[in-house]
């Protein structure tokens, strides 16, 4: 299993955060964790009614530098602010740094990040076994309505993550270099994470990305769900990775 940097303790994952006056549009932030030569921390923007308008994390200047070369990779666990876990289906964020990428060869075997926005408790995620040990949870898939059209399940599954579903229209699956894509995750019949997957080389281009997230027809858990995903390189050398345009489902 990957080296797990429990940079945020279980106490932090219960939702420690900083709050602003809820009578006005506001931002809640969670404690930062060390990453590379910088840090990472999550945040949620709220409207005057306390509902989410954007949710994501900031990678400070230096966070992409001097990342570990340890294989198979390093995981950074980020707490989410209280309002994020109360209003959206997301429980926490796990940043997976893959210095040599991962399978399939020739597509995702380049240095990249898996930005997992998890919908299940961390303790349950950590108990997901290797596929070869017990494939049952991986093979039990949700009803088709809970996944976007055009997504197919990848073979097998990943311990402490689950099964991964890919968008068959993604350019890297049709001979183009991998830059970024959007993955869905499932386990034991439930959608368990939404995952932007982004190449380090693409992050280094200082992108301004804003795109729609392909949506399922139905949502298992009531709450506010994002419809847009973005990456913004800022003048101070930091990056914002965000979900936005939330809709109550």
PLM features per residue range, with description:
Residues 2, 44-48, 105-109, 230-234:
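A general structural signal for short secondary-structure junctions and capping/turn motifs
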Residues 24-25, 38, 44:
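Phosphate/adenylate-binding glycine loop and adjacent helical scaffold
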Residues 3-34:
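Bacterial Sec-dependent N-terminal signal peptides
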Residues 19, 23-24, 66-68, 104, ...:
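N-terminal export/targeting leaders of redox proteins
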Residues 35-39, 48, 52-63, 122-124, ...:
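Intrinsically disordered, flexible peripheral segments
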Residues 107-124:
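Histidine-centered catalytic micro-motifs
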Residues 32-36, 48-111:
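Short N-terminal edge-element motif at the start of the domain
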């Amino acid at each position: 299993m990957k080296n797990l940097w429990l940079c945020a303790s279980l106490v932090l994952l219960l939702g420690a955060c900083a709050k602003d006056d809820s009578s006005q549009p506001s931002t809640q932030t969670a404690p930062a964790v060390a990453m590379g030569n910088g840090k990472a921390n999550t945040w949620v923007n709220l409207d005057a009614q306390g509902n989410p308008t954007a949710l994501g994390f900031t990678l400070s200047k230096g966070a992409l530098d001097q990342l570990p070369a340890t294989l198979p990779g390093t995981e950074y666990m980020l707490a989410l602010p209280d309002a994020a876990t109360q209003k959206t289906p997301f429980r926490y964020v796990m940043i997976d740094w893959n210095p040599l990428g991962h399978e399939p060869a020739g597509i995702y075997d380049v240095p990249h990040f898996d930005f997992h926005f998890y919908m299940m408790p961390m303790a349950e995620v950590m108990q997901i076994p290797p596929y070869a040990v017990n494939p049952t949870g991986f093979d039990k898939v949700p009803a088709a309505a809970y996944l976007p059209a055009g997504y197919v399940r990848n073979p097998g599954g990943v311990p402490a993550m689950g099964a991964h579903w890919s968008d068959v229209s993604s350019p890297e699956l049709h001979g183009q270099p991998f830059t970024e894509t959007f993955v869905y995750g499932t386990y034991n019949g439930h959608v368990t994470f939404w995952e932007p997957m982004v190449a380090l080389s693409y992050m280094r281009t200082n992108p301004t990305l804003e795109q729609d997230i392909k949506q399922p027809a139905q949502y298992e858990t009531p709450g506010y769900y994002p419809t847009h995903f973005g990456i913004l390189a800022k003048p101070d050398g930091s990056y914002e990775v965000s979900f936005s345009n939330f809709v109550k489902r």
